[in-house]
Regions:
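Short amphipathic C-terminal alpha-helix that caps PH/PH-like domains
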Residues: 80-81, 137
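Active-site scaffold of zinc-dependent metalloenzymes
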Residues: 15-18, 28-73, 81-88, 94
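Long, well-structured alpha-helical subdomains associated
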Residues: 69-72, 116-130, 135-232
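Post-HEXXH active-site segment of zinc metalloproteases
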Residues: 87-128
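Generic preference for flexible, low-structure residues
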Residues: 80, 92, 98-100, 170, ...
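A metal-dependent hydrolase signature that marks the N-terminal structural subdomain at the beginning
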Residues: 1-44, 58, 135, 196-232
């Protein structure tokens, strides 16, 4: 584990079961020859921006920032651990060539280095990867972490996260950091169960994102770095 003195102090203040989970992730990373980086800040630099945590198979690293409310530290660690599980399972959506290709297309388009005919269709492949991750995560939370974060709140923030990609497909820019999917005043607008489909951005949700979006570029709160080094 790569962890500084301040981060170690923060980690030691966490409940024992959470500390044990960090140790489990450390051992999992060691087994698969990944680095596990624990930051004392509220965000960690992913190489393409700052975020709460990320999993990168190209850099072989899982990283998380822990100077945040405990429930969201646990939520982000569970999310990145679920991306790790996707990577381990060679049959998962993580290894689907069509999904990877469209993820590349979408983020190249978002960064304005490539034009594509239908960004909404490409972004649905991003969402397919993330929604699979979120369903894995909600199972872990219900089984083990519901005393720290309510599954309903997690599902609401996960739904907000998925819809944020549909919004970005309309705006062609990263969402503003004013759009905080971990803020109750924002995530309370979304369903308490993870939706089965994310086909369209309703007018209601579009207006909600517009209300909070101030056109500032910001990396997403969660990240999973694909081999192409894009943040998801």
């Amino acid at each position: 584990v790569k962890i500084d003195k301040k981060a170690r102090s923060i980690l030691n203040s966490f409940p024992k079961d959470v500390q044990d989970y960090f140790q489990e992730i450390s051992e999992k990373c060691k087994k698969h020859q990944f680095k596990f980086r624990v930051s004392s800040g509220s965000k960690v630099y992913s190489g393409s921006g700052s975020c709460g945590g990320f999993f990168s198979d190209s850099h072989k690293e899982l990283a998380i920032a822990i100077n945040s409310p405990l429930k969201w530290v646990v939520a982000i660690l569970v999310h990145e651990d679920s991306h790790f599980d996707q990577w381990i399972n060679r049959q998962s959506v993580w290894h689907n060539p069509k999904v990877s290709r469209n993820i590349t297309y979408f983020f190249d388009w978002l960064s304005k280095t490539k034009n594509i005919k239908n960004p909404t269709e490409s972004v649905k492949h991003v969402i397919s990867l993330e929604s699979d991750c979120e369903r894995r995560s909600i199972k872990k939370i219900k089984k083990r972490w519901s005393h720290i974060i309510s599954p309903e709140n997690y599902a609401q923030s996960a739904n907000a996260y998925m819809f944020s990609y549909l919004y970005m497909a309309h705006s062609r820019k990263w969402i503003s950091d004013r759009i905080n999917i971990y803020s109750k005043c924002f995530y309370r607008n979304f369903p308490q169960k993870i939706l089965s489909k994310f086909e369209d951005l309703s007018e209601k949700y579009f207006e909600l994102f517009c209300k909070y979006d101030k056109n500032a570029r910001a990396a997403p709160n969660r990240a999973a770095l694909r081999p192409i080094n894009r943040s998801l």
